[in-house]
Amino acid sequence: MKSVLFLIGAVLSALASPGSSAAAEEPLPKYGPQARRLFEDRQYFREHEAVDFWALVGYYVPQRNDSSCSLASAVMVLNALRAGEALSAAEELVTQDGLLQRVSSSIWNENTAAGGPGVSLDQFAALMERALAEYAIDARVEVVHVDEADPDALREVLSANEANAGDFLIANFLQSEFTGDPAGAVGHMAPVAAYDAAAGRVLLFDPDRRWYEPYWVTVETLLAGMGTRDGAAGRARGYLRVVRTD
């Protein structure tokens, strides 16, 4: 009887405990195999001018909540576009609150509030055009949906962007494709801060600062993340290219 009770107790204990399989599972690393932290690999900036990186880094801000990555990305790029200007003492830098007030869009205000759905790539393009006008920045916005994977075409865009201080890219992607965290399987946006052509990788200033810091991903990984389908928009994600025209 005692042996039977012992056996029953052992079984119940195993069932009640997270135990063998679940408890033994190792937690996922902060970054999956697709991403490499800037802290671990910054040699590129010792050997290259990296004009976009230096224009953006002073304005690298966190998103305010899980829905406002477009807003934080816009703030970084708008400030970077004005980095070469001599602003007056009365002129504020672009902030997330200030940007929402000046653009005054119900879509941007409501969709980037806590719990909101965020904005699609096409919505973001229209909002960026309004933001450029509000801040009197002479620039155009180009929208590219990655409907077909073409790494060579993307490399050409990245190379031109890296050599030009007057244009910036904002990627729209499925975050889990980069970080490896299945909890991050959501649409996301982040500026491209640098392109290391020799290594075939890009640096992203991910505004999800609660969890991440700047990280590198390969061109192929970038393309895979941008080529995912935005279910709400009904088409593939992609990127914005914002180009000064003056």
Regions found by a protein language model. Give the residues of each.
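Bacterial N-terminal signal peptides
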Residues: 7-14
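Positively charged n-region of N-terminal signal peptides that target proteins for export
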Residues: 1-4
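Extracellular structured ligand-interaction cores
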Residues: 64, 189, 237
